[in-house]
């Protein structure tokens, strides 16, 4: 399943799923944060790289959100948490500010994830990993819905296998990714 309100991204997403062997790809035209989102399904896995450092008009925000904010990066995290079934797992790309922000909404989303979920890992990504599209410092947060957090595995990725400038030239195409996978599996 996938949702987007950009038809070009929907076409790209569908083609990507087909190329990766998904027989019946499903993507829907939907602004996930808006009042039009009436998706009730709960998912076992959510992988997402939502748009961040944006905001949404307060009048357009779905009434189901408990966070008092218009910041999309926080609203998406709450949405993903809510749409996971108990025991479901998510890996979400977030701006690093989500981890350290001091607003009440930042504190509330961290409290939700830590106390009503199990945050397993925070993987800090190198600055420039999303260039030329974004220079925002980012991380991947991995969590499960349910329980509470006891230990969090942290990893500071130095390289994703590509140059961190605007050209993003291939270095080895792997960087720290094999090490992250190996260490995350064993921890």
For the regions a language model picked out, list residue spans one by one:
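Conserved SAM-binding motif I beta-strand of class I
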Residues: 1-4
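Short alpha-helix immediately C-terminal to the canonical SAM-binding loop
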Residues: 10-12
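Conserved hydrophobic residues forming the short capping helix/wall of the S-adenosyl-L-methionine
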Residues: 17
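A conserved structural/catalytic subdomain of Rossmann-like adenosyl-cofactor enzymes
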Residues: 36-187
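Conserved SAM-binding strand-loop segment of SAM-dependent methyltransferases
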Residues: 22-32
């Amino acid at each position: 399943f996938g949702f987007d309100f950009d038809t070009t991204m929907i076409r790209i997403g569908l083609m990507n799923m087909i190329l990766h062997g998904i027989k019946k790809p499903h993507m829907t035209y939907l602004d996930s944060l808006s009042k039009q989102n009436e998706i009730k399904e709960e998912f076992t896995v959510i992988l997402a790289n939502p748009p961040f450092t944006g905001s949404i008009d307060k009048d357009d925000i779905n009434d189901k959100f408990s966070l008092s904010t218009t910041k999309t990066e926080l609203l998406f995290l709450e949405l993903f948490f809510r749409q996971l079934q108990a025991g479901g797992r998510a890996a979400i790309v977030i701006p690093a500010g989500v981890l350290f922000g001091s607003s009440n909404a930042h504190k509330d989303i961290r409290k939700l994830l830590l106390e009503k979920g199990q945050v397993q890992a925070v993987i800090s990504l190198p600055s420039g990993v999303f260039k030329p599209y974004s220079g925002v410092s980012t991380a991947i947060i991995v969590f499960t819905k349910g329980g509470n957090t006891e230990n969090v595995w942290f990893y500071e990725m130095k390289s994703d296998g590509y140059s961190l400038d605007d050209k993003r030239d291939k270095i080895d195409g792997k960087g720290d990714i094999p090490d992250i996978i190996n260490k995350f599996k064993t921890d």
